[in-house]
């Protein structure tokens, strides 16, 4: 089993800490792992259960502020990265069940590796390529794969994030190709200026933003398409926002409550028809149309939007919107 005590114990028993330190040193230095007391599993070096040492936080600083006649004291401290890799090649590694919190990757390559069930909370990467790698059921909460460094973003190709914890994941300006997000926890995740090509989503999407607009033209990012994206397995769009996204090559669930709106003119016409109405259904419908209008056809985005009628509180508002938009 991935979390079996034996996987961790071998790094803690006689010679284990020294072996672990040497493995990490070689990986950081770009040296091969040949000659170490390591086995291979399906062609990958067996590093299952590897645990990077936890850094100690600096002594907390404190500051006191006055507000409204009351005094508030805040304490804060910096937590260092657990491991930092510069231009390293992490290739053919089996790191299932590893403990690697707050990993930092600059200009690295990860290829043909397994991080299934690994604890990688707070991962950060810049100008890094990840390919043919699995993070199945890994804990990547509060991580970021959206850093901009050395004039480029991160590129992820053929990566498996199924059932992974990706909550509060930073994805800005990253490129995702053939990536599987099925049943991953994506709460509070923003695909900001991210490219999604041949990707799959399934399960509940909650508080996710897909932003296809070009918001930083000075970076020459090019288009941020959603192409051949499979969302047929999504069971709920809970507070999910699509901004400037084209649905021409997005496969949505076959559900009558999902309505793709094409053209801001249709939204404008709907708002005009609601101008003289003040009932509850009209108010909710108007608010939804005003929100859609903000992100349609502006800043390089597509002139399309998506409404999930199930998310409206008033059933009459859903009926009204359907009449106005279809």
Question: PLM features: residue spans?
Answer:
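N-terminal capping/linker segments that flank leucine-rich repeat
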Residues: 1-53, 263-326
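Tandem repeat scaffolds
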Residues: 13, 17-266
